[in-house]
Amino acid sequence: MKLSALTLVRHRREHLVNLMLSLDAQHRRPDELVIAWMQPEPETNLPATRFPVRHVMVEGDALPLARARNAAVATARFEALVFLDVDCIASPTLVERYHHALRRRAGLYLGEVHYLPADAVRRRADGMLDRERLARLGEQHPARPAIEADEIRPEPDPGNLWGLSFALMREDHRRAGGMDEEYVGYGGEETDYAWRLAAAEVPFHWVGGALAWHQHHPLYAPPWPHFDAIIANARRFHRRWQHWCMDYWLEQFSEAGAIDWSPSADRIEVLRRPGEQEIAAARLPASARYG
């Protein structure tokens, strides 16, 4: 069974280079990498790889994440699909473990992600990534479970799909109807996708040994730069599923007096929008690994 790795890119060249290097160093390399570009032109001078790299351009000034994922799937040649965020660096067994899990049984498989501090990524003298350093510095998110390297564990909650690293078969993506492209900008489209997969009776599992390291980028708490998209996408999700997603961020906005909302409410009322100083003040220090 052949396997396509898929990633989405907007202005993350160095992170993409590191992802590509890590995929080329896999115990079992992907049979291709599909890059969905959410920018006017693809990056140039990318590293050579021992697998084909295919490109698809995705239009949209706002971050068209759902459209880009669907475009990547449509471009992929193979039935087994591994989605990796461009901020990820794959550990050497990631593709091998996802491939093993999908051969064993179709479903949605989630891999562990450990978060790196700023300036964690280093190259060795031979130009390869210093994986020992990444393993030493990577930190597990407190909301995520630890998985043994050879373990496959059922996951009953579809809400635990975070879009950084997961795998499934093309047929299950099709059964779920793909991603809803009415979600535009940051937030909500992955949770909606998870519930669509669950409604299609696709089983969810954690798979050990499919570890990725998340490369650091600027973080905000509350995530004011994505305020408008989060509100619009949360409303869309609630209309479809009659409950809220992104509750953690909505609570932050509510506590800051920007929205009138509660988990039991059936609507969000925007009271004010963040100002430039408020956005700047919410930027977390470089030591923060997640918001």
Please provide the spans of the model-predicted regions.
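Short aromatic/hydrophobic "clamp" motif used to bind/position activated sugar donors
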Residues: 81
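Short, flexible, basic/aromatic active-site loop/helix in glycosyltransferases
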Residues: 129-158
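A short, conserved alpha-helix in the catalytic core of glycosyltransferases
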Residues: 160-168, 172-177, 183-210
